[in-house]
Amino acid sequence: MGQFNQTEKGSFEIKVALAEMLKGGVIMDVTNSEQAKIAEDAGAVAVMALERIPSDIRVQGGIARMSNPELIQKIQETVSIPVMAKCRIGHFVEAQILESLQVDFIDESEVLTPADEENHIDKHIFKVPFVCGCRDLGEALRRIGEGAAMIRTKGEAGTGNVVEAVRHMRAINREIRHLMLMDSSELMAEAKRLGAPFHLVQMVAKSGVLPVPNFAAGGIATPADAALMMQLGAQSVFVGSGIFKSEDPAKRARAIVGATTFFQNPEKLAQFSMDLLDAMKGIDIRQLKREDLMAQRGW
């Protein structure tokens, strides 16, 4: 079972505080209890329980849904670190089920097939904290406005290609800098342009940061990828297919954890990158059809 007690969850501030506890770490996708144990032993701060990692979803196709509750429970029984699980965008009943299972975080994820193409879940009505993906500042603030306690880049999951995660993180950073240069009288118009709640736009313009932790996800496959995202401003990283689609998952998991911790130390990063077997082959994003892009799901 994960370490966060359900009775400790509830208010938005508490949800954000729980997300803050995961800063500086790695959250790993796992599909069974054996992988969950490998992740925990490697130093992961949390695991994401799912039946198919994103690269398999791409290959196998079909409708990707919430994981089987039995799988989630087996993983909860195996590890002591927090256990997250994904629900489909807009599928609040899947979220209700996951909350009843006492998962530690719910990821309303574009990796799964959206259940609602117009509406995301009202996350404020849940006690369990949510994490959501974004491509830019407007999308981040819309999800936070709905109650997301943690934001991550969408990247392009299941590709082993970090280019989209870099694009999304840079977009967020650039738009925050732009916001900070604005006069207060310009912020309402900017909120309209971003499609974001005005009070959150005001908050970011004043503080220069998102009001919730900002993590990186999507295409991270190597220790260098993890360090790159941390140097760009991510506060933690999610790694999906990059670990268990590699030829040496346990060693690569440890290396990515180390690189996330020592992301500003090139000598250590070189050490973490040595003696690894081949990373996942990966996909050139330019070769994907528009309908195969997961990051475009949601709004």
Curated annotation (Swiss-Prot):
The protein's GO terms of the molecular function aspect are:
pyridoxal 5'-phosphate synthase (glutamine hydrolysing) activity
At the top level of its lineage, which domain of life is listed?
Bacteria
Concerning CDD domains, the annotation shows: pdxS (cd04727)
Q: Which InterPro entries does this one have?
A: Aldolase_TIM, PdxS/SNZ, PdxS/SNZ_N, RibuloseP-bd_barrel
**Residues given in the record as D-ribose 5-phosphate binding sites:** 29, 158, 219, 240-241
Which residues are the active-site ones? 86
Single biological process term from Gene Ontology:
amino acid metabolic process
- Where do the annotations place D-glyceraldehyde 3-phosphate binding? 170
Q: Which UniProt keywords apply?
A: Lyase, Pyridoxal phosphate, Schiff base
For this protein, the record's Pfam families field holds:
SOR_SNZ (PF01680)
* Annotated family: Belongs to the PdxS/SNZ family.
Question: What quaternary arrangement does the UniProt entry report?
Answer: In the presence of PdxT, forms a dodecamer of heterodimers.
Q: Which NCBIfam families match?
A: PRK04180.1, pyridoxal 5'-phosphate synthase lyase subunit PdxS
Q: What is this protein called?
A: Pyridoxal 5'-phosphate synthase subunit PdxS
Organism the protein comes from: Protochlamydia amoebophila (strain UWE25)
Q: Which gene encodes it?
A: pdxS
